[in-house]
Design a protein with these regions (language model features):
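Conserved mid-core segment of classical short-chain dehydrogenase/reductases
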Residues: 74, 97-107
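Conserved glycine-rich Rossmann-like NAD(P)H-binding loop of the short-chain dehydrogenase/reductase
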Residues: 34-51
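Flexible N-terminal pre-Rossmann segment of NAD(P)-dependent oxidoreductases
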Residues: 1-15
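Rossmann-fold scaffold of SDR-type NAD(P)-dependent oxidoreductases
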Residues: 17, 87-95
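Conserved glycine-rich cofactor-binding loop
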Residues: 20-21
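A conserved hydrophobic alpha-helix of the Rossmann-fold in NAD(P)-dependent oxidoreductases
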Residues: 48, 73-80
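N-terminal Rossmann-fold NAD(P) dinucleotide-binding loop
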Residues: 24-25
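Rossmann-fold cofactor-recognition segment
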Residues: 55-71
């Protein structure tokens, strides 16, 4: 049976990469408040610590990393595996908005 409502993510193990601001932060907070275990990653560790405090600190992992560094991503994954045994959902929302016209960049 499909879960719905507030308990849809309860107990799920979620890794949010890009969790320190914007969409990533909003998703991370919502997931924490819905009872998910959330691993928070970005380069800004102090910001991740603040976000982790929006819920039970035992349901969050703070894993500072730079997404351009493959070794850091692998170590982050290993940290989650050791703590929780796996990941149910990955949200990769790292990045930033750069206002450019469509004809000014390559796709």
């Amino acid at each position: 049976m499909k879960q719905s409502g507030i308990d849809q993510f309860s107990g799920k193990r979620v890794w949010v990469i890009g969790a320190s601001s914007g969409i990533g932060e909003a998703c991370a907070k919502a997931l924490i408040l819905q009872g998910a275990k959330v691993a928070l990653s970005s380069r800004r560790a102090e910001r991740l610590d603040q976000i982790a405090l929006c819920g039970d600190v035992n349901q969050s992992l703070v894993i500072p990393l730079d997404v351009t560094n493959d070794e850091q991503l692998q170590e982050g994954y290993k940290t989650i595996l050791k703590a929780w045994g796996g990941i149910d959902l990955l949200l990769f929302v790292s990045g930033m908005y750069v206002p450019l016209r469509a004809d000014n960049f390559d796709i």
